[in-house]
Swiss-Prot record:
To M.jannaschii MJ0417. SMART domains: POLIIIAc. Pfam families: PHP. This is Uncharacterized protein MJ1587. PANTHER family: EXONUCLEASE (PTHR42924), POLYMERASE_HISTIDINOL PHOSPHATASE N-TERMINAL DOMAIN-CONTAINING PROTEIN (PTHR42924:SF3).
Length: 171
């Protein structure tokens, strides 16, 4: 089964790279599902920053495209970002990682640490070893040089092999 479980839509908000501000994504939900279907991807998770709105909107198109949609969010905590999958409502940003994970699990969701060693994105780093996470992203397409992904892969495979989670499919 092909899945891409870390996708942002136009609802994801404004990102910052140093002093530059830019839309995190400009993708329409319809276009995301059209591309997913074309590539043979069967499941997508919409994980906009601090909102489930994009996931909710994309879920409405699920049957039209025959691609399963998981509603999620990439939530900013006091220490870094955590992805919640299978969410029913927004989780407030700015909570501790522990509180965020608790709120994800209260909804029956999964808590995933995205890009744990990113020098650019807000990352949890070695805190991933102390938290009750369901998975850790070991490949993130934003880090195309491979260095950050290799650090995550090597550390997670060594310490948490059952939680290594490649949540991005790349052909």
């Amino acid at each position: 089964m092909k899945a891409d479980l870390h996708i942002h839509t136009k609802y994801s908000g404004i990102g910052k790279f140093w002093k530059l501000k830019f839309p995190d994504s400009v993708e329409e939900p319809r276009n995301i599902l059209k591309v997913a279907k074309k590539k043979g991807i069967e499941v997508v998770a919409i994980t906009d920053h601090n909102t489930i709105r994009g996931g909710v909107e994309t879920k409405k198109l699920e049957k039209e495209f025959g691609v399963e949609v998981v509603i999620g969010s990439e939530i900013m905590t006091t220490e870094g970002e955590i992805i919640g999958l299978f969410l029913n409502e927004d989780i407030p940003k700015g909570l501790s990682p522990e509180e965020t994970i608790e709120k994800i699990k209260e909804q029956g969701g999964l808590a995933i640490a995205p890009h744990p060693y990113s020098p650019i994105c807000k990352a949890l780093g070695d805190r991933i070893f102390d938290l009750d996470l369901d998975g850790v992203e070991v490949f993130n397409a934003y880090h195309r040089d491979g260095i950050v992904n290799n650090i995550a892969l090597n550390k997670v495979i060594k310490e948490l092999p059952q939680k290594a989670f490649c949540i991005y499919w790349r052909e």
